[in-house]
Amino acid sequence: MAQLGAVVAVASSFFCASLFSAVHKIEEGHIGVYYRGGALLTSTSGPGFHLMLPFITSYKSVQTTLQTDEVKNVPCGTSGGVMIYFDRIEVVNFLVPHAVYDIVKNYTADYDKALIFNKIHHELNQFCSVHTLQEVYIELFDQIDENLKLALQQDLTSMAPGLVIQAVRVTKPNIPEAIRRNYELMESEKTKLLIAAQKQKVVEKEAETERKKALIEAEKVAQVAEITYGQKVMEKETEKKISEIEDAAFLAREKAKADAECYTALKIAEANKLKLTPEYLQLMKYKAIASNSKIYFGKDIPNMFMDSAGGLGKQSEGLSDKLGFGLEDEPLETATKDN
């Protein structure tokens, strides 16, 4: 009875162990591949719990999401014979799920060692062998990442389709200490030179700013002077126009006044000519004699009152001449002398 219990216990233990080894779990972002007797099975499984034949079947979980493979301490010899070392090179890659079986079959589940690690060593040595230390360490260092990525992806496209390289990151290589100090000194001198150049640019910029400021001030003064000069010219032109208008008005007034006086004189002359009739002249003659306070007696006095046609005509002409020139108000003096 005791032996039967022992057998049952052993059988139960074996069954539990078999069941435990048969049940396995695949994480999210992974694909399970199976081996039976060392041979890779064509079946794969996705995330979750799965069963397999215990003891004779084994599995490996292959990651299909983004992963970073680190290649450390990669030696590299330059064309000048200087040996340098890259401390760490990071390769970001992912595996397409439907390509898992083919890649694991051809390169095992540790495909990254054959396809990535070895390729990194090869490409870096190829790159360093055709470039100098100056180019690798300074001039072309920023191109190493992209060159490695392109070279890896080009080979993987033909050798292992489905393995995609997303990025490659390369750290600064370690160089011999003496050379490193020389580079540091060179970088220090270059930095000083850049600082001096920047200071010179700042000084030139300040001088240019001052020059532009002075130019703006000069233009401002010139514009103000031009505006002031224009105002003065406009004032002078306005004064000139006002003077011309005043002169024209004065000339027009004087001309109108002269024309009026001339017209008045002409009208007075015409009126006087119309008044110089013989009767009017005779009347004026009598008035002049009557108003004269001095009368000289002689033999010619009686003739003064004679209505002689010849004498009256001459006297009328003389009187008309006097009256025509505004002398109608002068007293007429008559004097007779004894011969």
From Swiss-Prot:
The keyword Endoplasmic reticulum applies. It holds the Pfam family Band_7. GO terms for biological process: cholesterol metabolic process; ERAD pathway; negative regulation of cholesterol biosynthetic process; negative regulation of fatty acid biosynthetic process; regulation of cholesterol biosynthetic process; SREBP signaling pathway. Deubiquitinated by USP25; leading to stabilization. GO terms for molecular function: cholesterol binding; ubiquitin protein ligase binding. GO terms for cellular component: endoplasmic reticulum membrane; membrane raft; protein-containing complex. It is a single-pass type II membrane protein. Residues 1-3 are cytoplasmic. Glycans are attached at N106. InterPro entries: Band_7 (IPR001107), Band_7/SPFH_dom_sf (IPR036013), Erlin1/2 (IPR033294). The chain crosses the membrane at residues 4-24. Keywords: Acetylation, Cholesterol metabolism, Endoplasmic reticulum, Glycoprotein, Lipid metabolism, Membrane, Signal-anchor, Steroid metabolism, Sterol metabolism, Transmembrane, Transmembrane helix. It is found in: Endoplasmic reticulum membrane. Residues 25-339 are extracellular. The keyword Transferase does not apply. The modification N6-acetyllysine is found at K267. Its main location: endoplasmic reticulum. Residues 177-309 are annotated as: Interaction with ERLIN1. Component of the ERLIN1/ERLIN2 complex which mediates the endoplasmic reticulum-associated degradation (ERAD) of inositol 1,4,5-trisphosphate receptors (IP3Rs) such as ITPR1. Promotes sterol-accelerated ERAD of HMGCR probably implicating an AMFR/gp78-containing ubiquitin ligase complex. Involved in regulation of cellular cholesterol homeostasis by regulation the SREBP signaling pathway. May promote ER retention of the SCAP-SREBF complex. PANTHER family: ERLIN (ER LIPID RAFT ASSOCIATED PROTEIN) HOMOLOG, ERLIN-2. Belongs to the band 7/mec-2 family. Forms a heteromeric complex with ERLIN1. In complex with ERLIN1, interacts with RNF170. Interacts with activated ITPR1, independently of the degree of ITPR1 polyubiquitination. Interacts with SCAP, INSIG1, SREBF1 and SREBF2 under cholesterol sufficiency conditions; indicative for an association with the SCAP-SREBP-INSIG complex. Probably part of an AMFR/gp78 and INSIG1-containing ubiquitin ligase complex involved in ERAD of HMGCR. Interacts with TMUB1; TMUB1 bridges the association with AMFR. Interacts with SYVN1 and RNF139. Interacts with TMEM259. Interacts with TMEM41B. This is Erlin-2. It comes from Rattus norvegicus.
